[in-house]
């Protein structure tokens, strides 16, 4: 397909990055979208809408947005199920929010889970566009890794006129085709393959019937698609697809949030991945192929912007700086605490943790006191899988043809059993071995000639389940 978007508007000089769950929300995206390209986070957007309604929707904006949804029967059902006048709460904090059913491979088109994903993205887009104004540019950020609700969120955002979609945390090779099918399919059901891990990797197809939500396709936007990547090789590969991205955001390893794994195996003394020459994208090759791209990661100054332009970029993407603004959805007290820490002489200690994220991607951690960056606070947090957005579908080894879900926040014994396929006794043996090693480093035992091969196999499975990538296990 030919090039669909030229990105000539001055707003495209700066893209405000999508962050977290409602950190970059409609307020921030609407404010930045007036003069830049504002992007809100679509991550868990159904849950965001649900909780705002259960908090009593104090500004009235959620109900305002829902009143614009084309199918009012769907909007009314959401209000009946989740809106709480004045945000009234029971005494038991565990019962503060009514939980939605989780997205599964068998989630029906008519389920409240699917409806809330469409409604949430529609509401967030509508409110951001209202704030950005007629000439503003507003986009939605999605994560490839959180694949089950993405198709429904795309539909909701497109119904409300979203201008672009940015997507990383994986290889988003299906999404340009999904956007095309939603926009030009005239109500024909749209499919999207979801990966099922385990022996004999397979996929199942999530289905979406746009006509249930959007009977009038004339009002549907045709957003630009930006793939968020780290290397020119992936850009070249994606650009050869029939439905290719319209542009690319190239993130350096210094970018906040998740990073791509380093191509080398070495770690520094803090356990951080060491990025080398092989991790540096060849921007000349991007220019030679005529691809439009933005640079991201430590690009928040005017000098950084000018340097990006000299390297052939259309502009820059900036995230963390916007997370600290008044308009971001970050908790105000935590935001101020981070700002206070940054302002001190020693600054904020930020490091790249290879194990912290259940996605398997390295993750930036800021050592902020009294948060889960402190091990003691993390350890006392109850492990419960009540949201399930990061669950992974696995082929059940004990029930051929069946799918089970592995949730990184479920009780650790259940998680390790599902992820490794080991028995409780085998897991207990590995835990005992860990306690006997220096610094609890199981990977040292993989080089120990006295350890049986079968035990080493179990250790590898255990380490992979805990989050270490196979490439780092020697």
Where are the predicted features?
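Conserved active-site-proximal phosphate/metal-binding subdomains
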Residues: 245, 253-292, 300-303, 310-474
């Amino acid at each position: 397909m030919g090039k669909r978007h030229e990105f000539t508007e001055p707003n495209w000089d700066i893209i405000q990055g999508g962050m977290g769950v409602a950190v970059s929300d409609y307020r921030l995206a609407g404010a930045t979208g007036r003069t830049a390209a504002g992007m809100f986070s679509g991550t868990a957007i159904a849950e965001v809408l649900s909780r705002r309604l259960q908090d009593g929707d104090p500004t009235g904006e959620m109900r305002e947005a829902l009143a614009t949804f084309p199918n009012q029967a769907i909007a009314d059902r959401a209000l009946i199920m989740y809106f709480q006048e004045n945000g009234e709460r029971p005494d038991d904090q565990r019962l503060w929010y009514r939980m939605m059913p989780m997205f599964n491979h068998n989630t029906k088109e008519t389920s409240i889970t699917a409806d809330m994903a469409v409604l949430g993205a529609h509401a967030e887009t509508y409110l951001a566009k209202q704030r950005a104004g007629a000439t503003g540019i507003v986009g939605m950020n999605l994560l490839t890794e959180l694949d089950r609700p993405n198709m429904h969120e795309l539909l909701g955002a497109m119904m409300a006129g979203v201008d672009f979609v940015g997507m990383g945390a994986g290889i988003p090779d299906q999404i340009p085709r999904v956007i095309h099918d939603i926009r030009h399919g005239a109500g024909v059901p749209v499919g999207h393959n979801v990966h099922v891990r385990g022996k004999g990797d397979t996929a199942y197809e999530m289905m979406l019937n746009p006509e249930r939500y959007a009977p009038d396709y004339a009002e549907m936007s045709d957003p630009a698609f930006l793939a968020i990547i780290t290397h020119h090789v992936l850009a070249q590969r994606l650009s050869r697809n029939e439905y290719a991205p319209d542009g690319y955001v190239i993130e350096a390893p210094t970018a906040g949030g998740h990073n791509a794994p380093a191509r080398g195996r070495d770690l520094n003394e803090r356990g951080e991945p060491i990025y080398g020459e092989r991790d540096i994208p060849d921007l000349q090759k991007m220019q030679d192929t005529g691809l439009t791209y933005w640079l991201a990661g430590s690009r928040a100054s005017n000098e950084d912007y000018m340097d990006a332009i000299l390297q052939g970029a259309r502009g820059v993407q900036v995230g963390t700086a916007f997370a600290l603004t008044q308009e971001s959805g970050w908790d105000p007290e935590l935001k101020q605490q981070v700002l206070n820490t940054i302002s001190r002489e020693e600054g904020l200690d930020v490091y790249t943790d290879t194990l912290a994220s259940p996605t398997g991607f390295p993750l930036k951690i800021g050592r902020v006191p009294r948060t889960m960056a402190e091990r003691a606070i993390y350890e006392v947090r109850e492990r419960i899988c009540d949201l399930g957005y990061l669950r992974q579908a696995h082929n059940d080894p004990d029930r051929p043809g069946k799918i089970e879900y592995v949730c990184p926040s479920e009780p650790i014994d259940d998680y390790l059993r599902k992820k490794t396929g080991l028995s409780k006794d085998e897991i207990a043996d590995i835990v005992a071995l860990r306690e006997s090693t220096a610094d609890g480093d199981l990977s040292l035992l993989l080089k120990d000639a006295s350890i049986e091969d079968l035990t080493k196999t179990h250790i590898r499975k255990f380490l992979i389940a805990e989050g270490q990538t196979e490439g780092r296990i020697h």
